[in-house]
Each structure stands twice: as structure tokens, then as C-alpha cells.
UniProtKB/Swiss-Prot annotation:
Its EC number is 2.3.1.46. It is found in: Cytoplasm. Keywords: Acyltransferase, Amino-acid biosynthesis, Cytoplasm, Methionine biosynthesis, Transferase. One of its GO terms (cellular component) is cytoplasm. Pathway: Amino-acid biosynthesis; L-methionine biosynthesis via de novo pathway; O-succinyl-L-homoserine from L-homoserine: step 1/1. The record marks 111 as: Important for acyl-CoA specificity. The keyword Cytoplasm applies. The active site is at residues 142, 235, 237. This is Homoserine O-succinyltransferase. GO terms for biological process: L-methionine biosynthetic process from homoserine via O-succinyl-L-homoserine and cystathionine. It catalyses: L-homoserine + succinyl-CoA = O-succinyl-L-homoserine + CoA.
Length: 313
């Protein structure tokens, strides 16, 4: 099934060249079906690149998804044209009266910044609190996962001494959990973060189901019992060259970044990297849309009620 996005969104041309079924708003308006409504709060600096990555994953589903893009505030962006933000992004005031089937909160390059020093921290807290009453399932990615754990469980910020960067092996737990349907016993996924997500720490201080872990990277995938809050500590949405671009950026800024682990052939940055996590990323998002969103959400979003959700699978 298609993904529905605004007719002139730049990502539409990219996705169509990849033979991804993108439906224009005008065509979708003539269909008499109940599409899912998903809101993406894009916290990454390069908005167009990030929105394209997430739309690519959302498109690989038999469900029609109507996507709205949300910006955290109206500050000018150094990496995204103002015209693009004004045309395709909503302010929170424009959506807070609505209900959504799903919310995705992206990562942000704030790994070494204390939460209270994040300029939009109070506004982010407002949005996350709003989501409890207006969104069926929220997917927190990388830095957003750490922020969500702070707000939902009051967990302190834990930071690694060295940045975790590369593609890591993970193993699954709770094999028959809906989010893991179709997963291999082990899989690869990229990480790019300072945050530390120890499985033992999460088990001690939360009631989360920890679904996938790495001996090196720690917790990768966890969810609340009712599947309304899903935490992904890595970047399954990343393109094959995203880690490379970050590595080159850090080199250019005079830093001494380690070469991303298990990423370049022969561990040589001169060799073009290959994405070894693409199928995992598509399956994860398909499962989230199907089992956490579609099969949980009310048909009539105007009758959204927290009481409708149970904590059992």
C-alpha cells in the first residue's frame, strides 16, 4: 500500500525513483478507506534527509499512511530552507487538537548536552505529555529514546566516554513478541550516540520489555507492555552513507573520531560502505505500524481513549 505525502515534498521524487509507492494527496482524497495518521517530530538538523529516510521505511507496508511533519519550534534552520519548513512542517499549535495513530520522534545531535540545557526541552516535554492522550503509539529513536526514558521513568542521563559509532550485532529476546515478528535470531543495526542504555539498568528501573540487545551497544529495542511507547536506541533509518558523512564531518571539525565499527570493507574509509541493516529497518517499522499502531488504534480517532489500551499482548 502507498504512503501519502504532500504533492511537492522533495522526498517524493527520491522515493519514486526507488519504485516506492507514493500517493499524491489529490489521489488519496478519492479513496474511501481509513488511512493511518502518523506524525513525525523531526529533531535532526538536516530535515529533508531525515524525513526521506523515515518515509522510506514507513512506505514498506500494506497500510496507507498519511504523514504530517512537525517542527519543535520556529527558530531558523542552518541546514534546511525556511521555505521548506514553512511549506511542509506544522507547528505544535496546529496539531495539538488532533489525535494520531502514531508519532515518531527522531534523534538529535545532543548526546553531550544535559537535558535541562536543551533549548526546547520544556516544549519537548509538553509534546511527549500530549502524546499520552492523543497518540496510539510513539516511537522514540536514538536521543529521543533517552529523552523519553527520562520523562516517562525519570531515568538519569548516562553517557559513554567514547562515542558509539558503527554497525553492531544484536540478538533478540521475547522471540514471539509482535515487534520481533520475522526477525532473525541475530541482526545488524547502526548506532551513532554517546548515550548508554544498559539492559541491566533498564531492567532494574523500568517495567519495559527489552526485545533486542548487543554485547557492545547495549539495549537496542524496548517497549512498554501496552506497546504505546517503543524505544529504538540506534538508527535503522540511516542510509548507507550516513555514518560515513558523520565521520567525515567530525574529521573536518578537528575531532579524532574512531572509524565506525563493522562498517567499511576492510575497515578502510576509502572503501564505499554497504548497508547491512536495510531489511531489518523495513521489518521493524512494518511491525510497529501493524502491531503497535494499526491493530491497537481506534477506527474513529475522535473517540481516542487511553482506557481502550491494555498492557497485555
Amino acid at each position: 500500500m502507498p504512503i501519502r505525502i504532500p504533492d511537492q515534498l522533495p522526498a517524493s521524487d527520491v522515493l519514486r525513483t526507488e519504485n516506492i509507492f507514493v500517493m499524491s494527496e489529490s489521489r488519496a482524497a478519492s479513496q474511501e478507506i481509513r488511512p493511518l495518521r502518523v506524525l513525525i517530530l523531526n529533531l535532526m538538523p538536516k530535515k529533508i534527509e531525515t524525513e526521506t529516510q523515515f518515509l522510506r521505511l514507513l512506505s514498506n507496508s500494506p497500510l496507507q499512511v498519511n504523514v504530517e511533519l512537525l517542527r519543535i519550534d520556529n527558530r531558523p534552520s542552518k541546514n534546511t530552507p525556511t521555505e521548506h519548513l514553512d511549506t511542509f512542517y506544522r507547528q505544535f499549535e496546529m496539531v495539538k487538537g488532533k489525535n494520531f495513530d502514531g508519532l515518531i520522534i527522531t534523534g538529535a545531535p545532543l548526546g553531550l548536552v544535559q537535558f535541562e540545557d536543551v533549548i526546547y526541552w520544556d516544549h519537548l516535554k509538553t509534546i511527549m505529555e500530549w502524546a499520552k492522550h492523543h497518540v496510539t503509539s510513539t516511537l522514540y529513536v536514538c536521543w529521543a529514546a533517552q529523552a523519553g526514558l527520562k520523562l516517562l521513568y525519570n531515568l538519569p542521563k548516562k553517557t559513554r566516554k567514547e562515542k558509539l559509532s558503527g554497525v553492531y550485532h544484536h540478538k533478540i529476546h521475547h522471540q514471539y513478541h509482535p515487534l520481533l515478528r520475522g526477525f532473525d535470531d541475530t541482526f545488524l543495526a547502526p548506532h551513532s550516540r554517546y548515550a548508554d542504555f544498559s539492559p541491566e539498568f533498564l531492567e532494574e528501573h523500568t517495567d519495559l520489555d527489552i526485545l533486542a540487545t548487543s554485547d557492545v551497544a547495549g539495549t537496542y529495542l524496548a517497549t512498554t507492555k501496552d506497546k504505546r511507547n517503543v524505544f529504538v536506541t540506534g538508527h535503522p533509518e540511516y542510509d548507507s552513507h550516513t555514518l560515513h558523512n558523520e565521520y567525515i564531518r567530525d574529521l573536518g571539525e578537528g575531532m579524532e573520531p574512531a572509524i565506525p565499527i563493522n562498517y567499511y570493507p576492510n575497515n578502510n574509509p576509502d572503501n564505499p560502505p554497504c548497508a547491512s541493516w536495510r531489511s531489518h529497518g523495513h521489518l521493524l517499522f512494518s511491525n510497529w505500524l501493524n502491531y503497535c499502531v494499526y491493530q491497537q488504534t481506534p477506527y474513529d480517532l475522535d473517540h481516542f481513549s487511553e482506557d481502550a489500551f491494555t498492557k497485555d499482548d
